[in-house]
């Protein structure tokens, strides 16, 4: 708290190129859009191989299906791995209810023997190489993966997921806010901003 400097948007006119939806979403954590510039957004979902998975993939429960034992990759992140277990149980991913968290933990412990690996960035590469059938990944991994393997598809399950946004900010201990603003101005050029 109180660690960021307000951004001087007069020095970053290209910030106007950032999509309005990102600015609106950013208000969930920066209500006045004073401290951050949204850059990139995405979701958490399931990347799966349509040749290896012979059923409709539209629910988190496929990550817990013993039929795919040894073919499941989960994120090596406590927060992200809890999302499927919480959502398929009907709970908020932001719950702080101990009973709900305990239930999700139990589901994940039961899933453990079915999981091939807990990975971060390399899950995409394992899926491209067809070393697994199903993986929990960020949406940003999907276009790259599907470009290299036509049998891969990405879905956000019907129970819902999280939507996230990465943003830029300037910390109070920044020694050169002028250069930070120049960097933001370049990063918000129209062709770059539209790509996000």
Positions of PLM-derived features:
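Generic hydrophobic alpha-helical scaffold/packing signal
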Residues: 124, 128, 146, 171, ...
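A ligand-binding cleft/hinge motif common to bilobed small-molecule-binding domains
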Residues: 128, 134-151
